[in-house]
Structure formats: C-alpha cells, structure tokens
C-alpha cells in the first residue's frame, strides 16, 4: 500500500539525512494523531466492536496481548462486551504521551506503531511504512481505519517545521 504526498517546499538541495529527518517528523505527526484517536482526515476512529468475542489462547491476538478479565473457557476467553472490553481490560494504558486518552488509538501491544518506520530515503524522496512483522495486519488496519497519511492541516504544519529547521523562518 502506497500513499504519496506532495509538499510545497521552497526549492532546496536536500541531503539524504535531511530527507530522513523530514520523514521522521511525519512519523511523529502521524503517531501523535493516532494516540489522540484520529484518522488522517482528523476524524475520530470508529469505536471498537461491542459484539461478544472469544480470544483463543492460540490466536495471534492472544500472542500480542494476553487477555485478562474475561470469562475463562477451555480454549479461549470470552469478552461479552466485545473487542472494546478485551482491549480495555487487557492492556496497561500508558498516558506517557500527552493526549493518549482515546479508546481507539490502534495500540494493543505497541508492535504495529513500533514497526511504522522510515523504510527508505534519498535526497529527493522517502518512503514510510510498516516492517514485515506487522505489514499484513497493519495495512489491513489502515484500510479499515485510515491512519497512514496526513491531513492538509498536518501537511501545512510539516511545511512550517521544515522551513523553520532549514531556513530559520
């Protein structure tokens, strides 16, 4: 999955390290927005399901975050309140990042966002995306919840950051 965006920057001769730094700024903007529970259109993420769910002890969901607080079954744990209940009861919420209060912030084990990185960079372009351990899952989540990308307001914010860092404006 590829997202392309154009930045209206002054004509500059940029180096690979500078382009990598710009890509890191974009990652930071996106991650902060995700922790606030917003997609790339700055809309709140759709709420997690309240439909009853069984988390199998052999599932990848179980491996990412061991279920806690549900009703124990022989091969699984039942959460009558759905995925929303599973997530709320099972994870240890960290509010270390200011504004990380959203119920839907795409953070379960943290593995997906830890693997959301700068994949490649040259002096003219860069690619951000997900590393192999989470690619399939992460890009599926992105199709459903749209987190990879920037809103116009964020693009404008990024342009101002780049201008300030490179031109001292």
Please state what every model-predicted region is.
Residues 1-169:
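Short, Lys/Arg-rich flexible segments
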């Amino acid at each position: 999955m590829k997202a392309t965006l154009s930045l209206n920057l002054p004509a500059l001769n940029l180096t690979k390290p500078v382009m990598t730094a710009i890509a890191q700024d974009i990652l930071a903007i996106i991650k902060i927005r995700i922790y606030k529970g917003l997609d790339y259109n700055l809309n709140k993420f759709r709420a997690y399901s309240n439909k009853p769910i069984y988390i199998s002890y052999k599932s990848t969901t179980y491996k990412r975050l061991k279920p806690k607080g549900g009703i124990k079954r022989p091969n699984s744990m039942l959460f009558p309140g759905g995925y929303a209940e599973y997530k709320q009861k099972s994870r240890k919420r960290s509010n270390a990042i200011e504004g990380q209060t959203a119920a839907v912030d795409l953070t379960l084990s943290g593995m997906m966002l830890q693997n959301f990185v700068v994949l490649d960079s040259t002096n003219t372009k860069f690619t951000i995306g997900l590393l192999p351990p989470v690619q399939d899952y992460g890009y599926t989540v992105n199709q459903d919840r749209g987190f990879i990308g920037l809103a116009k307001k964020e693009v404008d914010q990024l342009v101002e950051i780049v201008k300030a860092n490179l031109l001292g404006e």
